[in-house]
UniProtKB/Swiss-Prot annotation:
Entry's localization field: Cytoplasm
Protein name: GTPase Obg 1
Recorded GO MF terms: GTP binding; GTPase activity; magnesium ion binding
Lineage: Bacteria, Pseudomonadati, Pseudomonadota, Alphaproteobacteria, Rickettsiales
A Pfam cross-reference name: MMR_HSR1
Originating species: Anaplasma marginale (strain St. Maries)
List of residues binding Mg(2+): S173, T193
Entry-linked InterPro entries: G_OBG (IPR031167), GTP-bd (IPR006073), GTP-bd_Obg/CgtA (IPR014100), GTP1-OBG_CS (IPR006074), GTP1_OBG_dom (IPR006169), GTP1_OBG_dom_sf (IPR036726), OBG_GTPase (IPR045086), P-loop_NTPase (IPR027417)
GO biological process, one term: ribosome biogenesis
Organism superkingdom: Bacteria
PANTHER family xrefs: DEVELOPMENTALLY REGULATED GTP-BINDING PROTEIN-RELATED (PTHR11702), MITOCHONDRIAL RIBOSOME-ASSOCIATED GTPASE 2 (PTHR11702:SF31)
Quaternary structure and partners: Monomer.
Keyword Kinase set for record: no
Domain Obg as annotated: residue spans: 1-159
Length: 348
């Protein structure tokens, strides 16, 4: 399945049904009076954030979204039926912009969050509503109004607990595959990952959502490589998991290059809590690994975790889960109020 994270669509609410002009006609009732009913309201186009969908692929083939029109009123005081709403599921993390992409309209970053993109029109009024003491037989009515109509730009920013970052071929996809049931493509060459992947890891009662994005290279924040398009997908992760390939001749430069690209893209992103892992340690001797670990710790001023292909990952998952919980508590208000995160980490 293709990963689609942007789509421009046209949405239109349903038209309201027209009011009715009608008069009561029954045997032995000479002046029955007006009995035209009102028209029904048009349906609305509503987007709802759902965990059941992961991309905006649906909108590649459905660029025109319309709700149902309301039905017209009829005689005997019958009101027209309201048009059915068009409810469309979108991935959690979907943002709605105006047609030019300059103004943010809505940000659906919580499961179940809804937004009415195009409201339906109001139903027209039948002639029965215009009866008065001075006008016993009104013959006028109103038409239903048109529904709202917009062109909107949808952008997706993935919501995850842990964003896995690093240079190309650092082992990000392999780690995601080992931690989760995600069937990501894994090969020994750069840019194996061409689109973001999500996976859910479980260990000792802990549940963790991880996102793997394409590797970052120099000038990724300016569009080089694949990173520029997908850097936005880790903006909403709670913490960063930075993988550094132990076999590289200059691991400090590799680490600093990725950090620099994060800073150039967003200071907020660069300021997220980071866990550093020295990966592929099975390719070097224990002495070489210890030497590189100390070198990286000295440069980053952070504790560096070493990881080999055969290592069990349950303890790592539990550790990351604890770091995420700690970050959620101390996160600024922009994310700390997120009900999804609250339920996710307080359901135990």
């Amino acid at each position: 399945m293709s990963f689609v994270d942007e789509a421009k669509i046209h949405v239109k609410g349903g038209k309201g049904g027209d009011g009715c002009v009608s008069f009561r006609r029954e045997k032995f009732i000479e002046f029955g009076g007006p009995d035209g009913g009102n028209g029904g309201n048009g349906g609305s186009v509503i987007f709802i954030a759902s965990s059941a969908v992961n991309t905006l692929l649906y909108f590649r083939y459905n660029q025109h979204i319309r709700a149902e029109n309301g039905k017209a009123g009829s005689g005997k005081g019958k009101f027209g039926a309201a048009g059915r709403n068009r409810v469309v599921e979108v991935p959690v993390g979907t943002q709605l912009y105006d047609e030019d992409g300059n103004t943010l309209i809505a940000d659906l970053n919580n499961i179940g969050q809804q937004y009415t993109v195009a409201a339906g029109g109001r139903g027209g009024i039948g002639n029965a509503q215009y009866k008065s003491s001075t006008n016993r037989a009104p013959t006028y009515f109103t038409y239903g109004t048109l529904g709202e109509e917009h062109c909107v730009l949808l952008k997706l920013k993935i919501v995850s607990d842990v964003g896995i970052i690093g240079m190309p071929n650092a082992g990000k996809s392999s780690l995601l595959s080992r931690c989760t049931a995600s069937k990501t493509k894994v090969s020994d060459y750069p840019f194996t990952t061409l689109e973001p992947h999500l996976g859910v890891a479980y260990a000792n009662g802990c549940e963790l959502v991880l996102a793997d994005i394409p590797g970052l290279i120099e000038n990724a924040s300016s569009g080089a490589g694949l990173g520029h398009k997908f850097l936005k997908h880790i903006e909403r992760c709670v913490i960063l998991l930075h993988l550094v390939d132990c076999s590289l001749p200059d691991i400090v430069s590799a680490y600093e290059l990725v950090r620099q690209e994060l800073k150039l893209h967003s200071q907020e992103l660069a300021g997220k809590q980071e866990v550093v892992i020295l990966n592929k340690c099975d390719l070097l001797s224990e002495g070489e690994v210890r030497e590189k670990q100390k070198l990286l710790e000295s440069s980053t001023k952070k504790e560096v975790i070493t990881l080999s292909m055969g290592d069990e990952l349950d303890s790592l998952i539990v550790f990351l889960h604890a770091q995420v919980k700690k970050a959620v508590v101390t996160e600024p208000s922009d994310t700390s109020f997120d009900p999804f995160l609250y339920v996710h980490y307080n359901k135990k």
